[in-house]
């Protein structure tokens, strides 16, 4: 089998797995659940189902001569932000539209699946076309994760996943600070599989010596910041962050409440006590930065984060993942296919630690870095309006979360969000100058 044929076979396999997983995430929902938008930052489940199918139509329109979109009405509703295809529907009004109906969206989903499958099975696809379909698959994986965020906000423990596995055994690990030697580091994706344009090209960066924590910051550590009055002291906060927490009355991470003197949270496991040994989750960049200042530390740059995650000092090589080049599985990290629906305690994945000894750099929580999101030197866009239009007012996060599909994460993967967003599964780890 030729390399191109192998890639096409892998493409079809990933496509089938991804479409199946999307349906599995919504299989237990009631029809009424599909249309609700509980906040302006989330989207109704039916919109996610339709949008990932519409993006497949976008790809097919770029690869099939004289392609006609299924419906102008559908395109207008399902277009997120692609002005080249018309005026996008307002995000904060996605829950106000009763048409297309839920049944129509499901019919559309299956029709587009069949149409794309026919192309993937029967057409001769050049490398550029295959990369576009890989992009569409990875785009759907991104929306699977966004859907998981939204399902937690919508339903919490009333969501009944098809599969729920037991969390790993509790750990008694304590975080330590690991020294990383500086020097030149080749940053970016170095593999031969799909990656996004923003992970390329590989390029040299210079790093000074630094320290980085072996674990993400835990709930126990973050509680001390909260209880020490961290949210009430302006000296820890960026100006915009200080305005944000006062205007929104933020006093804790999202979902935390103090009831009868006990810190509680509400998530897929229900209303429960905050587990002190889990990574803190649902914090914004502002909160992560403020904590680091309070602790006398700082957030790592994304280059520092990537080197700590992927550089093998002993063998002088870079690996795709912290543990090596093997694809992720539940032994290495807590990702979507682990189906735990929650963060694991720190130290739960010794087989997934980096060559330097940093744990849980893949999975559990996305980790904020101090780096502004922009293109690497000599960046070339791979798909207009997909990533490069966001090169302003965003910070880079690394590592994935328990909602991230395993095929869409690696040590070089760059996520990005605005500094005030925190409904995602976001945490952080601290770094220090030496």
Q: What residue ranges belong to the model's regions?
A:
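Polar low-complexity intrinsically disordered regions
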Residues: 1-6, 118-121, 165-169, 247
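Disulfide-stabilized, aromatic/cysteine-rich ligand-recognition loop
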Residues: 2-43, 47-54, 58-115, 119, ...
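Functional-site microenvironments in short loops/helix caps that host divalent-cation chemistry
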Residues: 132, 136, 140-142, 146, ...
């Amino acid at each position: 089998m030729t390399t191109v044929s192998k890639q096409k076979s892998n493409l079809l396999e990933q496509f089938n797995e991804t479409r199946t997983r999307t349906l599995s995430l919504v299989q237990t929902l009631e029809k009424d659940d599909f249309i609700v938008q509980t906040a302006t930052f989330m989207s109704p489940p039916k919109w996610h189902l339709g949008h990932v199918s519409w993006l497949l139509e976008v790809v097919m329109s770029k690869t099939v001569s004289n392609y006609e979109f299924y419906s102008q009405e559908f395109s207008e509703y399902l277009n997120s932000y692609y002005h080249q295809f018309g005026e996008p529907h307002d995000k904060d009004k996605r829950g106000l539209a009763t048409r297309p109906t839920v049944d129509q969206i499901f019919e559309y989903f299956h029709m587009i699946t069949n149409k794309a499958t026919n192309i993937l099975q029967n057409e001769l696809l050049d490398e550029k076309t295959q990369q576009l379909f890989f992009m569409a698959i990875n785009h759907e994986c991104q929306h699977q994760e966004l859907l998981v965020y939204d399902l937690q906000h919508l339903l919490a423990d009333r969501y009944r996943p098809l599969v729920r596995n037991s969390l790993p055994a509790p750990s008694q690990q304590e975080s330590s600070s690991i020294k990383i030697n500086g020097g030149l580091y080749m940053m970016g994706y170095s593999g031969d599989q799909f990656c996004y344009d923003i992970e390329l090209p590989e390029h040299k960066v210079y790093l000074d010596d630094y320290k980085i924590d072996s674990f993400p910051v835990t709930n126990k550590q973050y509680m001390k910041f909260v209880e020490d009055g961290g949210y009430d002291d302006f000296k820890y906060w960026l100006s915009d962050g200080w305005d944000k927490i006062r205007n929104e009355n933020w006093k804790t991470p999202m979902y935390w409440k103090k009831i009868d003197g006990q810190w509680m949270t509400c998530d897929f496991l229900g209303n429960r006590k905050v587990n002190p040994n889990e990574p803190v989750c649902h914090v914004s960049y502002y909160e992560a930065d403020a904590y680091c200042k309070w602790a006398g530390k700082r957030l790592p740059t994304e280059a520092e984060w990537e080197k700590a995650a992927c550089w093998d000092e002993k063998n002088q090589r870079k690996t795709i993942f912290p543990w090596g080049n093997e694809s992720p599985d539940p032994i290495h990290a807590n990702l979507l296919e682990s189906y735990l629906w929650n963060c694991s305690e720190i130290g739960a994945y010794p087989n997934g630690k980096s060559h330097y000894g940093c744990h849980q750099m893949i999975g559990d929580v996305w980790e904020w870095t101090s780096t502004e999101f922009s293109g690497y030197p000599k960046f070339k866009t791979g798909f207009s309006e997909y990533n490069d239009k966001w090169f302003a007012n965003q910070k880079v996060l690394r590592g994935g979360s328990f909602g991230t599909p395993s095929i869409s994460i690696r040590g070089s993967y760059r996520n990005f969000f605005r500094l005030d967003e925190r409904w995602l599964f976001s945490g952080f780890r601290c770094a220090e100058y030496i």
